[in-house]
């Protein structure tokens, strides 16, 4: 679950990390009043969406008058911002962040992720702030400095100082950076984050460090013990189908193709998408119904898949290990009857009670194509789309 920049900076402040004075505003009038609270300009106004690339898309602007602030707010509030990280529809802008402008001398990068290979929280710092860290990693990886946190001792000040020296910081900046590092690491661990990024972390003309931007991603599996973060969720920034699927404990990701996929198990789901592509098809989604699939969840999964107007056929690929194929068959039959499926449905069942499941599908009298193998299923669903 991602947070907005203004929410990230609210958390930064509580962990002793410096950020520009700013206010999140929902109306043009609020935006003007925020400028008055901050004091003399110039100011920076930023659209609040869960996507990068806002500046290039016109969603971040340096302004010198309150009239410009009002004009920016009127231009964007209630509209959608399209960046290289969004789809063609963009994401809705419901808040504008108004901040005091900062005199920048140098831009740095500081971020952290969970490194699955080392099973540690790893901090990354670079002198190449203000640009995509992925680009830096690809072109000049030697400019990224890493520190892994020991899960027993947690973050240590010496690690912050070590990174500060590698970034070329001196004097009071070393202490300031160490404080930011310790605050960010504590925030990461206490709030069950999956990713955090300060890009850029700037050195001002006065020689001080300030968190100019903030990006936080919380671990969705830990939200049950993070009630404050749950309250910060902005459903408007999420795909409506993905949000609805999450309520049913379905892992759904919308894609751009026209073959809906319903599979149990993330690995099998990815393999299913691969074999659809191999035979010339385009998956419309990733959907994992999980190991504990019920008739109700399968029915809901069908509804979610078919809510996408692009879907011209549905591929159901079930391996019965924990889940019984006959129960999945009941769910498929119930969904087809309840939803009124008007597109071809190709089903491949294998494993626990697969024969019973296949018999139920055959006896249902519905227009469901039973496949004999994974390859056969992929070929049939691609052919079904081509025939429409």
UniProtKB/Swiss-Prot annotation:
Mg(2+) binds at residues 199, 213. It catalyses: succinate + ATP + CoA = succinyl-CoA + ADP + phosphate; GTP + succinate + CoA = succinyl-CoA + GDP + phosphate. Its cofactor is Mg(2+). Binds 1 Mg(2+) ion per subunit. Residues 9-244 form the ATP-grasp domain. Keywords: ATP-binding, Ligase, Magnesium, Metal-binding, Nucleotide-binding, Tricarboxylic acid cycle. It holds the Pfam family Ligase_CoA. InterPro entries: ATP-grasp, ATP-grasp_succ-CoA_synth-type, ATP_grasp_subdomain_1, Succ-CoA_synthase_bsu_CS, SUCC_ACL_C, Succ_CoA_ligase-like_bsu, Succinyl-CoA_synth-like. ATP binds at residues 46, 53-55, 99, 102, 107. Its EC number is 6.2.1.5. GO terms for biological process: succinyl-CoA metabolic process; tricarboxylic acid cycle. GO terms for molecular function: ATP binding; magnesium ion binding; succinate-CoA ligase (ADP-forming) activity; succinate-CoA ligase (GDP-forming) activity. Substrate binds at residues 264, 321-323. Pathway: Carbohydrate metabolism; tricarboxylic acid cycle; succinate from succinyl-CoA (ligase route): step 1/1. GO terms for cellular component: cytosol; succinate-CoA ligase complex. The keyword Zinc does not apply. Belongs to the succinate/malate CoA ligase beta subunit family. Succinyl-CoA synthetase functions in the citric acid cycle (TCA), coupling the hydrolysis of succinyl-CoA to the synthesis of either ATP or GTP and thus represents the only step of substrate-level phosphorylation in the TCA. The beta subunit provides nucleotide specificity of the enzyme and binds the substrate succinate, while the binding sites for coenzyme A and phosphate are found in the alpha subunit. Heterotetramer of two alpha and two beta subunits. This is Succinate--CoA ligase [ADP-forming] subunit beta. The lineage of its organism: Bacteria, Pseudomonadati, Pseudomonadota, Gammaproteobacteria, Enterobacterales.
């Amino acid at each position: 679950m991602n947070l907005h920049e203004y929410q990230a900076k609210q958390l930064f402040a509580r962990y002793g990390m410096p950020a520009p004075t700013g206010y999140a505003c929902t109306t043009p009038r609020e935006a003007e009043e925020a400028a008055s609270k901050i004091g003399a300009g110039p100011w920076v106004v930023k659209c609040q969406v869960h996507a990068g690339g806002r500046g290039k898309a016109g969603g971040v602007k340096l302004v010198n008058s309150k009239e410009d602030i009002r004009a920016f707010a009127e231009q964007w509030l209630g509209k959608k911002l399209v960046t290289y990280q969004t789809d063609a529809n963009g994401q809705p802008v419901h808040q504008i962040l108004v901040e005091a402008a900062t005199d920048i001398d140098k831009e740095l990068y500081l971020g952290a992720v969970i490194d699955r290979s080392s099973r540690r929280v790893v901090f990354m710092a670079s002198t190449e702030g203000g640009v995509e860290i992925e680009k830096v990693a690809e072109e000049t990886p030697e400019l990224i400095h890493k520190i892994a946190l020991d899960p027993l001792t947690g973050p240590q000040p010496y690690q912050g100082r070590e990174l500060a020296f590698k970034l070329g910081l001196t004097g009071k900046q070393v202490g300031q950076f160490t404080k930011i590092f310790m605050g960010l690491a504590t925030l990461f661990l206490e709030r069950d984050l999956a990713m955090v990024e300060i890009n850029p972390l700037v050195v001002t003309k006065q020689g001080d460090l300030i968190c100019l931007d903030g990006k936080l991603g919380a671990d969705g599996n830990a939200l049950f013990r993070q009630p404050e973060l749950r309250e910060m969720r902005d459903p408007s920034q999420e795909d409506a189908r993905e949000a609805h699927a999450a309520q049913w404990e379905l892992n759904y990701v919308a894609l751009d193709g026209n073959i809906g996929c319903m599979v149990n198990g993330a690995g099998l789901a990815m393999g299913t998408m691969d074999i659809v592509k191999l035979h010339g098809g385009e998956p419309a989604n990733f959907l994992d119904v999980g190991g504990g699939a019920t008739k109700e969840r399968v029915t809901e999964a069908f509804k979610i898949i078919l809510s996408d107007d692009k879907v011209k056929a549905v591929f159901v690929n079930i391996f019965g290990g924990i889940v019984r194929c006959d129960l999945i068959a009941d769910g498929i039959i119930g969904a087809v009857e309840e939803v009124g499926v008007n597109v071809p449905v190709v089903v491949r069942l294998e494993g626990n009670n697969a024969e019973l499941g296949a018999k139920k599908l055959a006896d249902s009298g519905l227009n469901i194509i039973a496949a004999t193998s994974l390859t056969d299923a992929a070929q049939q669903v691609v052919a079904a789309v081509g025939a429409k």
